[in-house]
Curated annotation (Swiss-Prot):
Residues spanning the membrane: 24-44, 82-102, 114-134, 156-176, 178-198
Record's subcellular location: Cell inner membrane
Pfam families reported for this sequence: Cation_efflux, ZT_dimer
Residues annotated for Zn(2+) binding in this entry: D45, D49, H153, D157
GO biological process entries: intracellular zinc ion homeostasis
Protein name per its UniProtKB record: Cation-efflux pump FieF
MF terms in GO: cadmium ion transmembrane transporter activity; ferrous iron transmembrane transporter activity; metal ion binding; zinc efflux antiporter activity
Chemical reaction(s) catalysed: Zn(2+)(in) + H(+)(out) = Zn(2+)(out) + H(+)(in); Cd(2+)(in) + H(+)(out) = Cd(2+)(out) + H(+)(in); Fe(2+)(in) + H(+)(out) = Fe(2+)(out) + H(+)(in)
Length: 300
């Protein structure tokens, strides 16, 4: 799984870096030629895109390193650390755009050669849509947190490029403050996206449980298995591509140890079929020794 995961995520990061680098050069020329603060916003965002995508590429390769003596659970948390760092950089760029927008709102300046800005923005819009489509496919295949964060950022770029088109069109017809107003809006949206990304990264670092639907899938597998009288203490978390799942199964007091082991092993394999590559730990308890306070999500 890790080889396929690493290959797909690396391709997504390389594609994002290449596209952002090409668009950066185009936007530098367009900003110099038009003086548009909205294009400046897009230019700064492309710089952030390059940094984020390069970081994702390096971090994914590091996070896929096998566990060692000092990191017995692997290196998957590196993805969350990278996402947290990216959110800080993106917040700084959003603040810069916001302040620049205020400056141009107070002292608006007419745009030069707005048509060039429209062409550049259209190129950026089409390119970003293609990248987001590819990233969405990779996320569906890998569930990578790094690519999902990158995809959300590029989705905001699609919205930003659409807003820039509107701003340039309005400025063309004399609404010179529209450019600054849209820059302010873009800055606010980027800040919101950065804070959301940072929140998700912190939750991952704090070992937030798997989503409700995934935990429910685990419960469904366990409750359907014959020979299990109950279950409790379901604990889950995720680190990079790996899910960690722990659960206690309650069985008949007189069940032979070998048979209890076979049942637990069958349940483990069923969970792994649903969540390939997971780290599953199952503890078997005699049902009579489980205190009522510990009885969990079902009892037969």
């Amino acid at each position: 799984m890790n080889q396929s995961y690493g290959r797909l995520v690396s391709r997504a990061a390389i594609a994002a870096t290449a596209m952002a680098s090409a668009l950066l050069l185009i936007k530098i020329f367009a900003w110099w030629y038009t003086g548009s603060v909205s294009i400046l916003a897009a230019l700064v965002d492309s710089l952030v895109d390059i940094a984020a995508s390069l970081t994702n590429l390096l971090v994914v390769r590091y996070s896929l390193q096998p566990a060692d003596e000092e990191h017995t659970f692997g290196h998957g948390k590196a993805e969350s650390l990278a996402a947290l760092a990216q959110s800080m950089f993106i917040s700084g760029s959003a603040l810069f755009l916001f302040l620049t927008g205020i400056q141009h709102l107070v002292r608006p300046e007419p745009l030069q050669a707005a048509g060039v800005g429209v062409v550049v923005t259209l190129i950026a819009l089409v390119s970003t849509l293609a990248l987001v489509t590819f990233q969405r496919w990779v996320v569906r295949k890998t569930q990578s947190q790094a690519v999902r964060a990158d995809m959300l950022h590029y989705q905001s770029d699609v919205m930003m490029n659409g807003a820039i088109l509107v701003a340039l069109g309005l400025s063309w017809y004399g609404w010179h403050r529209a450019d600054a107003l849209f820059a302010l809006g873009i800055g606010i949206y980027i800040l919101y996206s950065a804070l959301r990304m940072g929140y998700e990264a912190v939750q991952s670092l704090l070992d937030r449980a798997l989503p409700d639907e995934e935990r429910q899938d685990i419960i469904t597998i366990v409750t359907a298995w014959p020979g299990i009288r109950g279950a409790h203490d379901l604990r889950t978390r995720q680190s990079g591509p790996t899910r960690f799942i722990q659960i206690h199964l309650e069985m008949e007091d007189n069940l032979p140890l070998v048979q209890a082991h076979v049942i637990a092993d069958q349940v483990e394999q069923a969970i792994l079929r649903r969540f390939p590559g997971s780290d599953v730990i199952i503890h078997q308890d005699p049902s009579s020794v489980v205190p009522a306070a510990q009885q969990g999500f079902f009892e037969r």
